[in-house]
């Protein structure tokens, strides 16, 4: 996780939005350049900072991020994006995350906890194994403190995991949620995972206006 100090500036954003970040003097560069859009993992209630979390990959941008010395300045543009925490609190929400797609939901759930908002949410988070699961302990803590939050973890390649191990599809969701029609779904993760989960929900008869999604590609 990388945290940027806003140096006293106030930046207003909705949980789930993203920012364009430009590395001003990166140690590595490639044809994609030093500018990327990144979903913020911190909440608007965490004033004065913007945090991002990503899987480390062998791209110039990520290698540069990993090696930035403390105090390095970067350029952060104004927030964008419509994949944000819905304003309606009277619905039953299902947040579905694949891997590092959890970042967007960490921002939302942290905000809900800090503001004491009455959302009813089931978070379904799919990972390869427990070791690679981001924010596991923190999110379990939020779940323990909020009776309106339930978390379902599925570890698809972890022999030692004693919980759910299936990939996310309509049958798996139905086993944990019951009637799928009564929920509104927010889906974030790798594009293939997002497409697959969206497709299985549509095949189960869930209307388009109850499904919102955002893919996270490598950068």
Model-derived features with residue positions:
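FNR/FR-type flavoprotein reductase catalytic core
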Residues: 48, 57-219
